[in-house]
């Protein structure tokens, strides 16, 4: 009878668990594809209910650490001697490529297919190598690594991170100002993005991976459900 009861709510379990641990906080979960930015005030979850409403409020950002097309994160980049260059809208590189190049994730963390996986049949180790990731990043400016050089490829990766940090910080500052929140609690594989955004806003940062470990933090909704069920029964 209520179609909203079937809506995507894995974030709700995490937020419910966090609300019982930290009464006033911005809960952020940066995953492979999306980012949840959930205000918790006085132990109450203040987030909107549907994905549409959360997208409008900035509580859901459709951008993550692995699967996001670089072309949805950036429209232009600086390469070479600070030359501005538009980028292609094709799926040439994803955020996993940027963070592999920058050293924030490993080849094992790169759990999705790369945009050019078809070219690496049976050679996944090569597909998820740093040099292959730099080659994919060079393609977003319709070039290759030989033309733009490794420094420019790394520069593109750094600009991807800078853009994602800025977008997250913009959502966080809205909630900070609206609810007077001064702490962010972070889960997911993108802890490093959240920390940088929190530092830029001078907000206290708490990483759940430092408490529960990286594996639990990366799958925090499942962990939260298990803990909530224990309390229920």
Enumerate the predicted regions with their spans.
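Conserved Rossmann-like nucleotide-cofactor binding loop
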Residues: 33
């Amino acid at each position: 009878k209520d179609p909203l009861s079937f809506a995507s709510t894995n974030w709700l379990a995490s937020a419910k668990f966090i609300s019982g641990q930290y009464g006033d906080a911005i809960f952020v979960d940066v995953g492979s594809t999306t980012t949840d930015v959930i205000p918790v005030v006085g132990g109450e979850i203040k987030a909107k209910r549907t994905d549409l409403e959360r997208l409008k409020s900035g509580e859901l950002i459709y951008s993550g650490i692995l699967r996001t097309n670089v072309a949805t994160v950036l429209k232009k980049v600086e390469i070479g001697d600070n030359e501005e260059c538009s980028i292609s809208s094709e799926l040439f590189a994803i955020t996993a490529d940027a963070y592999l190049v920058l050293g924030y994730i490993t080849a094992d963390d790169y759990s999705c297919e790369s945009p050019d996986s078809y070219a690496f049949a049976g050679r996944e180790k090569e597909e998820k190598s740093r040099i292959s990731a730099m080659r994919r990043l060079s393609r977003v400016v319709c070039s290759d690594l030989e033309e733009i050089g490794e420094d420019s490829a790394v520069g593109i990766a750094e600009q991807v991170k800078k853009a994602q940090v800025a977008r997250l910080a913009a959502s966080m500052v809205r909630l900070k100002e609206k609810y007077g929140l001064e702490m962010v609690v972070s889960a997911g594989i993108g802890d490093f993005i959240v920390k940088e955004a929190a530092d830029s806003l001078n907000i206290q940062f708490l990483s759940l991976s430092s408490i529960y470990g990286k594996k639990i933090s990366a799958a925090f909704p499942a962990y939260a459900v298990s803990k909530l069920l224990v309390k229920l029964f």
